Amino acid sequence: MRPGRGRYGGIMTRRAVVTGASSGIGEAVVRALRASGWDVVGVARRAERLEALDAAVGSASFAADLTRAADVAALAEHLEASGDLHALIHVAGGARGTDRVEDGRAEDWQWMFEVNVLSAQRITAALLPLLRRTVSAGGGHADTVYITSTAAQTAYPGGAGYNAAKAGESMLVHALRLEVNGEPIRVVEVAPGMVRTEEFTLNRLGGDQEAADRLYDGVEQPLVAADVADVVAYALNAPGHVNLDLVTMRPVAQSAQHLLARGPLVPRSPEA
């Protein structure tokens, strides 16, 4: 990676906002960008975790709930008053439950659409004017990066609510890329498969740690948050004319959304 460099005519400090920064992939993205020379503002609901991250890596933070329009407006006002903005990395999202379609709870589906689709629209609408202001002032290009999921691409039993929400977010990203065509704004989607983080599966399964652990039983090297963060950093630090429209990434053990090898990965004998 080329720290702090795009097609800006040299090295300069760029500033990014990372949502969902209090844990998991969002936290890993903050760490990766700080390591490559970015100024970073981490955004999440849990202020105490953001403050601990700031102390560890030198990021800044802003506590906000992206489901609240007033919080998003306050974030945009803070960012506008405190400097240029070159990138939005939207990680915040989540899944709730594994119900079949016929058993799905409306409140769970509504929550998933709120945190995955509407929050993405809300934060994009609020910060796109700031990204445009930066590039209009000679800031080269701007970036928007969205962490979706392979669940947006392939349905699976018990995943309908999350499948639908992530597919909605993915289509939002595709539409945005078309809408900003002709502007120096990159729109990147990163769609991870199985990622082992401290909270995602646990939250989805209602805090059942045993059930969460079973999901990963026997899987040799599922992705971890830092793997996704590395891809985000690569996309941001690529030359400014290069847009990675969609990066789908899975662990080697997961060939498709519904095909997962459990146990050691063993090469076939050449004679087989």
Question: What does each of the following model-derived ranges do?
Answer:
Residues 149:
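Residue(s) in the substrate-gating loop at a strand-loop-helix junction
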Residues 22-23:
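Conserved glycine-rich cofactor-binding loop
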Residues 99-101, 105-111:
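Substrate-binding pocket helix/loop in short-chain dehydrogenase/reductase
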